[in-house]
Amino acid sequence: MRIPLRVVTVTTAVCLALGGTTACSPADRAVLFASACSDSTAFPTAPRHEPGQAHLIGQVIRSGLPMGPVPGWDDVVSVADAGTTLAAVHAGGTVSVVGVDHDGLLAGTAGGAGQTLLPRRVPGVSDAISVAAVGSAFLITHADGTVSGWGDSFIASGGLRGDSPVRTTPAAVQGVDEVVSVADGSLSALALRSDGGVLGWGVNLTEILGEPPGTTVRRIRDVPGAVSVSDASGAAVIATATGEVCAWGNNVHGLLGVEPRGGQTNRPVRVDGFGDAEVVQVAGGQHFALALDSAGTVWTWGRTVTGILGDGTTDDTVLSSPRPVPGLPPLRWVGASESSPYGIDGAGALWSWGRGPVRSPEPARDTRPRRVPLPGPAQTVTGALVLLAPGD
């Protein structure tokens, strides 16, 4: 059988060289012949939120920042949680940070202090529309579609390995433009462009950045028109304009929807199992993925040990076929941070299942869906930080 050149990944190239597909493992063959995604065209726009209060529902690592409303963050349109440090974009386009100065995440605002309990403005930023946390770096998307970063210099500089491991001043990520949003992540950055393409940089051991091998900024090849992009720890998962879900990277946790598990690929493959559902948004956590369809149903797959199934079980198994999460009302948004899945319904109520809110002082005893108490409707969640809707 002749295999198109664009289908051949580094892993499969090795086994093909050793003797054709019969020399490949069953997992490699399964990924090699997985269904391709349908061609589509998309023109996603930047997510917009009303200026509201940022509210902390979990603990900030190594910080004395109390849970509840973050002082000075009552006009916020985007938030990001890097574990030790929080960042927010204000309605006027400025950015401020609070927490611990790990890897320069306070952007030089702490004046040598190890942490701050009051937000401090990040210098040199006046036109931000959103912020994301990728490992120990913050990446902001500007109104003109460019991206700047600070913190861990490997991510903040676009996958370049410089002389200093830390960047304390925001600077442009070269080669990145026309971006509408950047996905939260850990080892790699994934940025959604206004033409439905995806840019990536960072660690590429699982081929999450596609071809060629390397760590620097590139447009990931053969991605159909994407409307939503997420990082599920070693695999990228997208929703396309046709309502399909596609994924690439590592399949050890079944995130590519292929059996037997294992293998990896740098080409997007279609994740089947959604029936007639039209998926409009995706989210990625620690080795699991979520998909929201147009009817408000949430689907999940991947490693199940954290209770992502929402049925009360926490068996350490892997689900490669998406399954609806029971016990939830129709949702309008889904998100995931580390081992915690989240959802927001039409009234703004925040739902969580699995192990519960990130870094909560009281981990959930029951992994079934439950409402998270909040002083007002939620617009979005990142880590342990909720952006509330404006009050009446």
In which residue ranges do the predicted regions lie?
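Eukaryote-biased RCC1-like beta-propeller repeat architecture
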Residues: 4-12, 17-392
